[in-house]
Amino acid sequence: MSNHSDQIVKKYILNQSFVESSFFTKLSELKLEKYKLDSSYIAIHGFQTHPTKLNKFNDTPVLNLDQSSFDDTLNDSRINIPGELFNVNTIEEFKSLDKLKLLNTWGQNVYSEVTNATSFDYKLFNKFYILTYSDLKKYKFYYWVAYPTLSNTWTVESESQETDTTITQLVETELDNEYGQFFQYYGGKLHKSVQADKEHTFVFIDTCLSKDRKPSSQLKNYLYFIAYKGIKEIDLVTYRNNNLSFTQHLKLDAFTDSPKISGWERTNQGKLGPKLADLGSLINPLQLAEQAVELNLKLMKWRIAPDIDLEIIKKQKVLLLGAGTLGSYVARALLGWGVRSITFVDSGRISFSNPVRQPLFNFEDCFSDSGQGEYKALRAAENLKRVFPGVDAKGICLAVPMVGHPVTDEHKERENYETLVKLFEEHDVIFLLMDSRESRWLPTLIGAANEKIVINAALGFDSYLVMRHGVTNQKDRLGCYYCNDVVAPNDSLSDRTLDQMCTVTRPGGALMASSLAVELLVAILQHPERNLAPHDAETKFGNIPHQIRGFLHNFQQTKLFAPSYVHCSACSPRVITEFKQEGWEFVRKCLDDSQYLEDISGLTKVQQEAELAAKQLLEDLSLDDDVSNDIDEDSEWLS
């Protein structure tokens, strides 16, 4: 062993962290869905390269963190280092925290574990902490890793590059079996606990291969531990796998029972300070958009609506019948709620008056190769994908067969009917957003027969109606759009003036009706019975009315309930039964002659009875008039 004339204070290589982007991706996911506003300490773990696998590039001890750092199960093939994560909720808190005080608090935890240790368990001596702030909106993550170290000064009395081959062989055997980082050597064996009365030869397995033979700073807590046990002079063998192990004779310079705590990680410039991981430029833009859309929704669960079920909303397959003003606004609102599957059905083309009222269309959409506007359904789906590429949006050009409009091309209309039936089977929710009354009849009937969630939105000039349809097995069944009618819907589109052909409404009404329709759906989905929920049923997210009627002339809104009607032309048991039995044949008869529909539903009989009652009432009133006239004539003689 070569001696130095001057004693040298023992020096170390400071730990560095390597935090992969997957660590922050996992942290953001857990922050949103699990931790929320909870800033309690979270148990995590990092890992280091096994000493037998180090190479010349591993000149610094590195702690690795990735998405697996949050797992409960550990990878036994790696050296797992326990740690704790302290995630604060604001950047102001991150900046204003007293970092020295925080480090001292962590250091006291390490001090307690080290001084009470019964063995050289590396997990007790190497615990780390990480202070973080997650800016989930900008995908920026501020972090600062600390390795609390108990300061104690040792001087190198002498040093040699020669080591006892017996010790190195024992170390290599030990590493093949079970990882340990620090041992006491006596009696020809390596021991995992300290014995002050035995030979003071200790072995440290280094986690870096620095060229100047400075060991990792992980050694410092072990040295403090043996000093705490009263050992003041040792021979230390620092093992390295590249045949560059070395031996030093160390002497304790001074010992204090209240050690100074150090350990904040330095930046790449060698300065004390936190680091910033900006993942915004690294994440795929589509993935960024997906996460950003879900961000606002998941933030609801932090405080405002912790019990809301967002997943059931997201997985709904929604069919929009009508891709005009109502359809455009409903689609945008559904996107905002996280719905990912939307299908538009419409047969119309985009006209020059549409883009200002229908937000899914632009001026350029008013042109196509045929000289007409683009098809609304197709362009609505395309433009919705431009708003959010992650949506599964489809457009289908289809004219819904309408009651009271006789069949002129049976092959085409039957094909449209069959397509519509198939679409109902494939979707969970149907919105009726068309601009005529009779066009809603067939979808109402198919929805009732299939017991789907059907939501209807309709506009007047300065009023609107939003309602949900009842289902057949519902207690106190809710009525549908036609349950208040005593006649079947008929042709309302022919022989109209210009102001009747255009949808003449106050522009704001469409936004209000559309948003209420979507919010009504969300409320339904939060109820355990879904569309079986009664009128004004309560959920953790509010009430579920049957109907909402709004009036813009006095800015009033009313919740209403109307029960189903046994003779309804769209949802009565007799009509549904006939539809299930005959299918297209029944529909064709109704399209050709709305009187047939009235006969089947019983409305004809209701009308006849009403006429008889009215006739009887008139006769009764006429008789009363005759009697009163006689009394007036007799009164002249009695006066």
Curated annotation (Swiss-Prot):
It holds the Pfam family ThiF. It comes from the Eukaryota. A motif (GXGXXG motif) lies at residues 322-327. One of its GO terms (cellular component) is phagophore assembly site. InterPro entries: Atg7 (IPR006285), Atg7_N (IPR032197), Atg7_N_1 (IPR042522), Atg7_N_2 (IPR042523), ThiF/MoeB/HesA (IPR045886), ThiF_NAD_FAD-bd (IPR000594), Ubiquitin-activating_enz (IPR035985). It is found in: Cytoplasm; Preautophagosomal structure. GO terms for biological process: autophagosome assembly; cellular response to nitrogen starvation; cytoplasm to vacuole targeting by the Cvt pathway; mitophagy; piecemeal microautophagy of the nucleus; protein modification by small protein conjugation. Keywords: Autophagy, Cytoplasm, Protein transport, Transport, Ubl conjugation pathway. The active site is at residue 502. The keyword Cytoplasm applies. Its main location: cytoplasm. The keyword Cytoplasm applies. GO terms for molecular function: Atg12 activating enzyme activity; Atg8 activating enzyme activity; identical protein binding. E1-like activating enzyme involved in the 2 ubiquitin-like systems required for cytoplasm to vacuole transport (Cvt) and autophagy. Activates ATG12 for its conjugation with ATG5 and ATG8 for its conjugation with phosphatidylethanolamine. Both systems are needed for the ATG8 association to Cvt vesicles and autophagosomes membranes. Autophagy is essential for maintenance of amino acid levels and protein synthesis under nitrogen starvation. Belongs to the ATG7 family. NCBIfam families: E1_like_apg7. Homodimer. The GxGxxG motif is important for the function, possibly through binding with ATP. This is Ubiquitin-like modifier-activating enzyme ATG7. It comes from Candida albicans (strain SC5314 / ATCC MYA-2876). The lineage of its organism: Eukaryota, Fungi, Dikarya, Ascomycota, Saccharomycotina. The gene is APG7.
